[in-house]
Amino acid sequence: MTFYDHTAIEPKWQAFWADNHTFKTGTDASKPKFYALDMFPYPSGAGLHVGHPEGYTATDILSRFKRAQGHNVLHPMGWDAFGLPAEQYAMDTGNDPAEFTAENIANFKRQINALGFSYDWDREVNTTDPNYYKWTQWIFTKLYEKGLAYEAEVPVNWVEELGTAIANEEVLPDGTSERGGYPVVRKPMRQWMLKITAYAERLLEDLEEVDWPESIKDMQRNWIGKSTGANVTFKVKDTDKDFTVFTTRPDTLFGATYAVLAPEHALVDAITTADQAEAVADYKRQASLKSDLARTDLAKEKTGVWTGSYAINPVNGNEMPVWIADYVLASYGTGAIMAVPAHDERDWEFAKQFNLDIIPVLEGGNVEEAAFTEDGLHINSGFLDGLDKASAIAKMVEWLEAEGVGNEKVTYRLRDWLFSRQRYWGEPIPIIHWEDGTSTAVPESELPLVLPVTKDIRPSGTGESPLANVTDWLEVTREDGVKGRRETNTMPQWAGSSWYYLRYIDPHNTEKLADEELLKQWLPVDIYVGGAEHAVLHLLYARFWHKVLYDLGVVPTKEPFQKLFNQGMILGTSYRDSRGALVATDKVEKRDGSFFHVETGEELEQAPAKMSKSLKNVVNPDDVVEQYGADTLRVYEMFMGPLDASIAWSEEGLEGSRKFLDRVYRLITTKEITEENSGALDKVYNETVKAVTEQVDQMKFNTAIAQLMVFVNAANKEDKLFSDYAKGFVQLIAPFAPHLGEELWQALTASGESISYVPWPSYDKSKLVENDVEIVVQIKGKVKAKLVVAKDLSREELQEVALANEKVQAEITGKDIIKVIAVPNKLVNIVIK
């Protein structure tokens, strides 16, 4: 039996593509464009795992498909190469993180090339290249000039072990850091912030313009968290102090019986009485040790301390005790809430715990038993009594504004973006702080501000980054003799990834971020494929920067990514014991089709789980390519199931994909290829072209491969294969298995040219129609014959054909035919006696 040798074929075609620059981006202005983007990887020391190629294969199939359809295709790859692991490695080993990063990139690139992806490597970007981060810094200076980058003393999530602050999104629900699992404490520090909140409404509105999964849009909507309500001002009794509360339910103000401030609220110390001072100070200290996520956990027991002061409810003059509690965050809203315990579960629990008044102001429910959180007509609410929710809100806002104690207000949950990191391995923030108290941005002519090479990569000990140790870089003197100090914080890893898709469009431009005409030609990105874990942060940050650049006239579109697709996760083979604990694969043996723990003998259940080093179930693509070939890996990952589903890796599935490709190879290389069309494959071939074309366009790659299999099965039943159908089929399979596609194309054409730009096959609609149908002939209700006849034969013709059939003749000879019922295209029923 013939098998193809992937170890010879694959390197041969990879060399051909590289030598001939086969995938250089097309520049013919008369052609339509297609920009296919992958989320570029962080080049870790571990290299690629089999999860990476799933998304990369999808965009590669689309890119090859669109090239064949006559598009200019931009399909680039690059490296998101700043980040903590390289810095940690440098601190542990004393080596330069740049060298470590370069080695990792070389390894990633080798692995990617071995998979036959059609990237245009002339457009490769690397976020750690000064020629790249010059423009990251340039964008920062523009944000600074527009007042969108500012310094603030903010409570940050400080991780002592990492020597840096981390963003809210990087804190796990248990209050530890996502990276390393270290304790996180709240600590006030001078930080750079980006004013993403200035774009909140546009970030929300423009989600309507993009073709993204609704689930991702919802996550962004929730993160932005728009709410409409009112600000209400409360005076503090016997003082000249007041504070403002934002509420979405100003109509419930008559039911506000106490107020709660965040422990960090600026007013707390000023209004705390001497009796309560010690308890308040102690509580503030405890709150500072908790992350925002831990503080707002709904399940935790409510804690709080009274300040000793009272606020005056503006609508009824009632006194409301003012408490502090850690579930109120200084960074959210105004850092103060009015509590309506009758109609809010958290307020109700707090009121019950500390014996505070509960006054119902909405009809329905028993507030002694539980908070009533549904809608009802207003009661105990003076001029609002009897009104429904909408009417009462409108009337209360009108009253607040007339009395000068409040106003209508729209707020967002979105916070400004904490942009600085106390790390070495990141883009230097191009700002100089002068001894006269002013700060200036580094002028564009002096960009890039290059990260200094240093052996001294260790925390400075002051909370500043290791750059504070590099004094000859740090200290500068202006022409007028004024001394200055460079900013020591660096940018987060999110910075370089917020605009990389723009640099791919014009990666070698030294004068500007990218040429306007090229940006007009290529934007927006037509398809962006990557993991759903980036749903909020990366995508929101990139959209924010894009909108700023749009306002500056740098980019021509409001949105960067027209269509987004999240591939599923490839899960590893893993096993669970009776307690539900996962067991590493090297501790498992298979006996008689069941799995057992090597040490305890306990029978285990097979359960797919995320691939991880600890479970020893990470599959390295190098091993798969060596054993089965890159084309097999590509076809298998696309055939596993829908692209957005999470599916377990299977060796059997891999073997099945390889067997299929061997059958394809045999079909084209051993079947007699003829210039004469017998017509036998007309229907299945045209169906295959139609189905594969439509399904690739819709990214339904698994069903496209299934249809290719249908064609192979049909073609194998014929003695000969029509040359045009053989070529068309090879073109259809080439985006999935490009090395094999090229090899078989040469076997059929000997053209010496790549298959990549051969026009995509078309189909003949008339051949999709069945010209023949199978009908059954029943005698006495039993099927006696099956006949293939021309479609749409009349009743009379059908009856004639059926009665002339040999098998039918044998059944009816010597019998009386009572009646013949003929149903066109279906059956003939003969009644005899």
From Swiss-Prot:
Domain of life: Bacteria
EC code(s) of this entry: 6.1.1.4
Ranges that cross the membrane: none
PROSITE patterns for this protein: AA_TRNA_LIGASE_I (PS00178)
Residues at which ATP binds: 613
A GO term, aspect molecular function: ATP binding
One Gene Ontology term from the biological process aspect of the record: leucyl-tRNA aminoacylation
Pfam families: Anticodon_1, tRNA-synt_1, tRNA-synt_1_2, tRNA-synt_1g
Cytoplasm recorded as keyword: yes
Record-stated family: Belongs to the class-I aminoacyl-tRNA synthetase family.
Name of this chain's protein: Leucine--tRNA ligase
Organism: Streptococcus pyogenes serotype M6 (strain ATCC BAA-946 / MGAS10394)
